[in-house]
Amino acid sequence: MDDFVRVGGLGAVSAALPRALRPFADIRIMLPGYRDIIEQLTHIQIVGRCPSFADLPACSLGRAATKDGLPVYVLLCSQLYDRPGNPYGDESGRDWPDNDIRFARFASAAAELAMGKLDKNWAADLIHANDWQASLVPAYLAWRGAKLPSILTIHNLAYQGLFPKDSLRRIGAPESAFHIDGLEFYDQVSFLKAGLVYASHLTTVSGTYAREITTAEFGCGLEGLLRLRSDAAELTGILNGIDESWDPRSCAQLAQQFGAGDWVGKKANADYVRKQFGLAVSRGPMFGIVARLVHQKGIDLVLSAADEIIDAGGQIVVTGSGEPALEQALIDAHRRRPDAIGVAIGFNDAQARRIFAGSDFTLMPSRFEPCGLSQMYAQRFGSLPIGHQTGGLAETITDGETGFLFSRPSHESFLGGVRRAFEAFMAQDQLDSMRRSAMGRSFSWSISADSYSALYRKLAAV
């Protein structure tokens, strides 16, 4: 959850969607008791205890609230969650070897909470799980005979939570679940597949991605199962929204606040970013990247095109973290061209806002993109996105009006989009018109909340 811990877009979504849904229902969030969360929550009240079973240790469930009063349950088990690094791996980026235990313990407790067995004062009408880390929740409900409806949202099908066959015993799952119509996936246990099989309904974070994952190209080996769920009208795409407090007219983190048409204010932010990153004074376009630095995001395509972008008069600024090899490649590129490439490894909220505000274009050459948030924030700040025509990028970028789309995740196709951006930059009237159109777009969470609320009511029959 973005209030306490952020890993990719999932943290932002799990913070924003519950708040948007508060007018419709009694929404409560459950999180593992990660170190960062425990340090920031105060007045945690123990409401229930989970005994050990299989290889899952005993734990306690605490209840607290966010600063704005949103109820939060936290699973307290220091041996599983009180660790350095990120929620999924150690400080060197390696996955924790007991991630099957860590997330099975969480999912089992979430199922117990939903069934009314942990907090005596509350039970759920419906439970909404997200990604492989919570995908066992619908499975545990089914194995315990609960009739509670459940939703699984797939934020990225490529992350499946795969573990050795012995994990089945370790997490207390029935042996009968290890088959092609259960958790088995090429002789491994797939946590994600558990949710795909047992959840009452599946959602993804854009309609385009919902269609894409039923194909072999994007289905990651699960397209057959997903086609069955889609054909049964049990797979829905609901586009994510963004935090609308990210507004260039009011962001205190900017060098100068600005609105549509105030290009002097936008230039002031560009000058600030250039100075911050040690880039040369330039009248050329600045290309920003705010992303996880992983293969999926097409960072290698940016690296392969960097010299051509710079030789044409452009500059590149990057912030994000991810695969060590890509991080190092970006650092090396900066060292070769320190006047034209700026790199900040790690995610910083203020830094991201400043890059969106200062850049003329935002590069998003993702090989696939279930939804994507950066292209929506970029438009809000007048930074026109250049994106591969896939997933949420295809739904949120209007080609030639609020940004640029290219057809294939290849060097030449990507450069084609970049060249169109250069042409627009040289045509001031076109650039101004596109910026105004982009900054006028609305990506409110209220639209997503309406869709989820309707789905909740349908499944819970309330």
Swiss-Prot record:
It comes from the Bacteria. Belongs to the glycosyltransferase 1 family. Bacterial/plant glycogen synthase subfamily. ADP-alpha-D-glucose binds at R6. The keyword Glycosyltransferase applies. The gene is glgA1. It catalyses: [(1->4)-alpha-D-glucosyl](n) + ADP-alpha-D-glucose = [(1->4)-alpha-D-glucosyl](n+1) + ADP + H(+). Gene3D superfamilies: Glycogen Phosphorylase B. GO terms for molecular function: alpha-1,4-glucan glucosyltransferase (ADP-glucose donor) activity; alpha-1,4-glucan glucosyltransferase (UDP-glucose donor) activity. One of its GO terms (biological process) is glycogen biosynthetic process. It is an enzyme of class 2 (transferase). Synthesizes alpha-1,4-glucan chains using ADP-glucose. Keywords: Glycogen biosynthesis, Glycosyltransferase, Transferase. It comes from Bradyrhizobium diazoefficiens (strain JCM 10833 / BCRC 13528 / IAM 13628 / NBRC 14792 / USDA 110). Its EC number is 2.4.1.21. This is Glycogen synthase 1.
